[in-house]
């Protein structure tokens, strides 16, 4: 279940605008497949608040210029303050862990962070592709659905066993093409992170 417990002192407003009750550091980074790492990131309560807030905002749209269109909603559209809080958190808490795996990466912030919604009759799957970023990440926001696994054919890995709130990361370009399998029941929500490419030097 994704609903916060009744004794939890934080509501959605505190979570979304104050980043309250967001951080989960219970699981250290572990390598789960070739050049892929997994670590805890968000609490279930924060994930559920993201879903409720995204649905309240609406606007899950496919962008016409996107070569791999999905029903997406950027966190920057929901709240620039939320986007900034996430960007700062990832830079200070998550990126140093990633540098243990990939020593020569530098943090240049987020290119985007967006929620993708999958359901039958709408966005049911996502074709095989790779991203245009330095590092990509995916956070499963709920698990009350079937199908829609994030699959990496070259690495022989899927996110089926990944817990809600955990962050799966991989190098974005060339080596890690991935897809979302068809959803078979329920509604899936996931948060995609694109870490910005290194800045061009003049």
Predicted regions and their residues:
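N-terminal accessory regions of S-adenosyl-L-methionine
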Residues: 1-22
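Short charge-dense sequence patches
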Residues: 1-7, 34-49, 86-89, 115-120, ...
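Short linear sequence motifs
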Residues: 3, 10-12, 35, 76, ...
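Proline-rich intrinsically disordered, low-complexity coils
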Residues: 4, 9, 28, 34, ...
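Non-heme Fe(II)/2-oxoglutarate
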Residues: 15-107
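Catalytic core of non-heme Fe(II) oxygenases with the double-stranded beta-helix
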Residues: 92-202
């Amino acid at each position: 279940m994704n609903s916060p417990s009744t004794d939890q002192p934080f509501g959605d407003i505190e979570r979304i605008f104050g980043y309250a009750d967001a951080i989960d550091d219970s699981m250290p980074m572990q390598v789960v497949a070739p050049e892929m790492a997994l670590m805890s990131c968000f609490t279930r309560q924060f994930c559920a608040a993201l879903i409720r807030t995204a649905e309240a905002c609406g606007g899950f749209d496919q962008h016409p210029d996107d070569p791999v269109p999905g029903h997406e909603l950027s966190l920057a559209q929901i709240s620039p303050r939320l986007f900034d809080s996430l960007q700062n958190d990832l830079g200070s808490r998550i990126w140093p862990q990633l540098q243990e795996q990939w020593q020569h990466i530098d943090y240049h912030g987020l290119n985007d962070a967006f929620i993708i919604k999958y359901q039958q009759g709408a966005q049911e799957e996502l074709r095989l592709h790779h991203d245009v970023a330095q590092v990509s990440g995916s956070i499963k926001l709920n698990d009350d659905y079937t199908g829609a696994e994030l699959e990496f054919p070259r690495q022989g890995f899927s996110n089926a066993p990944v817990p809600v709130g955990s962050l799966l990361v991989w190098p974005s370009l060339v080596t890690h093409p991935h897809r979302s399998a068809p959803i078979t029941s329920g509604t899936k929500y996931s948060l995609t992170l694109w870490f910005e490419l290194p800045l061009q030097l003049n």
